[in-house]
Amino acid sequence: MSFVIAVPETIAAAATDLADLGSTIAGANAAAAANTTSLLAAGADEISAAIAALFGAHGRAYQAASAEAAAFHGRFVQALTTGGGAYAAAEAAAVTPLLNSINAPVLAATGRPLIGNGANGAPGTGANGGDAGWLIGNGGAGGSGAKGANGGAGGPGGAAGLFGNGGAGGAGGTATANNGIGGAGGAGGSAMLFGAGGAGGAGGAATSLVGGIGGTGGTGGNAGMLAGAAGAGGAGGFSFSTAGGAGGAGGAGGLFTTGGVGGAGGQGHTGGAGGAGGAGGLFGAGGMGGAGGFGDHGTLGTGGAGGDGGGGGLFGAGGDGGAGGSGLTTGGAAGNGGNAGTLSLGAAGGAGGTGGAGGTVFGGGKGGAGGAGGNAGMLFGSGGGGGTGGFGFAAGGQGGVGGSAGMLSGSGGSGGAGGSGGPAGTAAGGAGGAGGAPGLIGNGGNGGNGGESGGTGGVGGAGGNAVLIGNGGEGGIGALAGKSGFGGFGGLLLGADGYNAPESTSPWHNLQQDILSFINEPTEALTGRPLIGNGDSGTPGTGDDGGAGGWLFGNGGNGGAGAAGTNGSAGGAGGAGGILFGTGGAGGAGGVGTAGAGGAGGAGGSAFLIGSGGTGGVGGAATTTGGVGGAGGNAGLLIGAAGLGGCGGGAFTAGVTTGGAGGTGGAAGLFANGGAGGAGGTGSTAGGAGGAGGAGGLYAHGGTGGPGGNGGSTGAGGTGGAGGPGGLYGAGGSGGAGGHGGMAGGGGGVGGNAGSLTLNASGGAGGSGGSSLSGKAGAGGAGGSAGLFYGSGGAGGNGGYSLNGTGGDGGTGGAGQITGLRSGFGGAGGAGGASDTGAGGNGGAGGKAGLYGNGGDGGAGGDGATSGKGGAGGNAVVIGNGGNGGNAGKAGGTAGAGGAGGLVLGRDGQHGLT
């Protein structure tokens, strides 16, 4: 017997190409007709006239033949198109009865089919999304909560089959009564073996003038055990009168994948806390904590706390803490870095987040404290760096404490720099954080430098003591009138004392230091760098670069902060770590611009073989344009974490001001994830863009993009930073959340693409859009594309909420493949943002699947006076179900169409509900 195989999509593509070719030829013929069908004779003689008539006749004959050919071409294209449609219809007619007969007994016995997607919960009901078929299928999306005195909770997304993505949680309903509470977002559904967890639903808004609290974002769904990304937590709900809702926690990773990113806190008088990052899988890193919400109302404006980073799996690194939210009076405290897994072989603890800026418009206030660095595993690995304290017009925030290393080997985390104070003579800089304790072999962490200010500078943090082999950490240098911290002692067997170490009472230790000074002297004279020892830190206010660590081992010195002035000067770069082991120094903060622009933060120093990159310096605060944050330092080639990008500087006047952009996260080594991008600074006119996440190492994931800065009541929020691309075998990083703004919310950052040769890695999720008071809210970022086999495209980010404008559109889900040889699941489209009096945002389209895999579900439209449209479900190709269409924002709206099922096996996706 002979068989004929037809692929309708290939036939349709060929028909499109032929139609384009026909249009091109027709255009060329029309252009040539005037010059070839009626030629003028070259002269008045009969021969010239005859030649002109002959060529004109040839031209007219050619045009007549071309018209016949064009007509034939059109009929051929029509036949090809009709034939492809006939093949598709015939296959659908043949497959549907077969699937129905297969599913019927399983559905009757268990309540769920063998192959097929779960049904969506209806909008406005908070109904659960249905569970997918046992074998192949995506979970249905949870229904949105109802609008009322207290908003109704969104429904949880349905669970996936063995192969499929979990459904997205439904958005919480809006609370309208005084003291009402917005509905909680529904939890995302979990995947089983291969597939991504669903994103948590956004918390509902509270729109009353008295006492309303935004709803809590939903928890992200867990990733598939063998492949797929964990779901991101939903953003907390907006509050017009009191506290924004807390962001939802990220979902847990699978065996090899990173935990989901925590949701951003909601905007309010007091910003909501960011959600905690999800726990990493067995070999995966913890997810990054969500950024704290913007505290936006006058003297009550307090930024929300950043979420803590998720703990690493048994063998994974800890997640980075989220940045504290900025506040018009007081900045929010940053989240702490997550601890690495107990048995990790060199994985580092997560870095603490940067504290939120305080007193950005009204003059008073204090910056938020930087988060503490996470601890390494039991035996090996370096501690995470402490976060930088936030800028405060009255007082800078304290830097975070560095994390402790493993007991046998690893360096202590560097303490965070104290936040800068304002230019007034009564202002105070924040104290630097203490450096962390190392293992038996490793350097003590450097103490953070004290923060600059127009009044009293901050004191420096103490350096950590070495144990057996390693240098003591540098004592942090105090700013103007602030004392420097004590340096740590060198190791008992070998190691130099850190800067400003106290006098030892041990004769052996003093003799050891004299011998090291003698050994280092010729090397320093020849190269400007010791053999064993730390680099010197730059003095605050000078912008000097930190010195490089010793050639064998040593930490790089911290860069000095830039000087304040009309335009602030740039901070110094951190010094490089030693060749064998050593941490890169932190970049210095940019100087405050008292009547102009803030100085740029210095870049963090890079490690070489074993060690973590330094954190980029925070951009200087300013009256016009905040300084750009410094880039994070690169991780060591073999072991160590990449440095975080520095946060952009904020603006502390109510005029035309723009926040500085966050710095790019550092690049990873072979096995480490890229560093997270810095948060954008706050500005009255426009918040700064978040920094892009750093590129992942050869076998590791890209870093998370930084959140966009917040804009003022008539300004725009900054765009979230793009997620870093995965290494050759790694997953893409998640995009950062967009900043909040009165007139326009910032768009969420796009997710990073997975590496080209990945076997199970997924594209990064897009960031959520920022909220807006009276304009259009930010759109969710598009999800990144998946890797080679079994990965999922990243989910699109949810659109932001708008009180009196238009809700943000949901981001498009990432594709499960780029070329026809790839397989994987399409990412789900993000949900459109809701609006109280305007139009809801449209849901994002689901991503197209690879050769084998389900299409992504379309995102639900946002609720509003005019309903947002549901996004279309993505198509499957050979084997797999089409994605479900997204629900309309409310009854009477337009729902999204379901995607087409696979040619060989798979059901069409269900249409969304209205």
From Swiss-Prot:
Signal peptide: none annotated. Residues 412-431, 895-914 are annotated as: Disordered. The keyword Repeat applies. Residues 895-904 have a biased composition (Gly residues). It comes from the Bacteria. GO terms for cellular component: extracellular region. Keywords: Repeat. Residues 1-93 form the PE domain. Belongs to the mycobacterial PE family. PGRS subfamily. This is WAG22 antigen. It comes from Mycobacterium tuberculosis (strain ATCC 25618 / H37Rv). The gene is wag22.
